[in-house]
Amino acid sequence: KTEKDHNENVRAIQKEILKNGPVTCGYQVFDNHYDDSGFSSTGSYYDTKGDYLFSHAVSIIGWGTEQVNNISIPYWLCRNSFGSSYMNAGYFKMKRGSNFCLIESDVWAAEPFAVYESDL
């Protein structure tokens, strides 16, 4: 994909979250993610170290930007399935906009529909 294609994909993910809520994504887990040594004190994961271990799925619930060493880093806000004892009450941040750990390549969204009592 070109950078333009990738930027359009990021915008599509953001639009989907705004319109219908969280999306599910798969991403690559490396040693320093699995043992938590790659996370900053704010629960941010921006650098891989070690071997690729496996793929994992989380929900992307939002996005933002934070300052790290006077550098503005865009991130996805992710909700893990490990429960509230993981990271920041079950949430963590992953670098946004660079397809970090392939997080922006493997995204799914459900199509919402309404069920009415008269349909039951």
What are these regions (language model features)?
Residues 1-77, 84-120:
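Predominantly the structural core of cysteine protease catalytic domains
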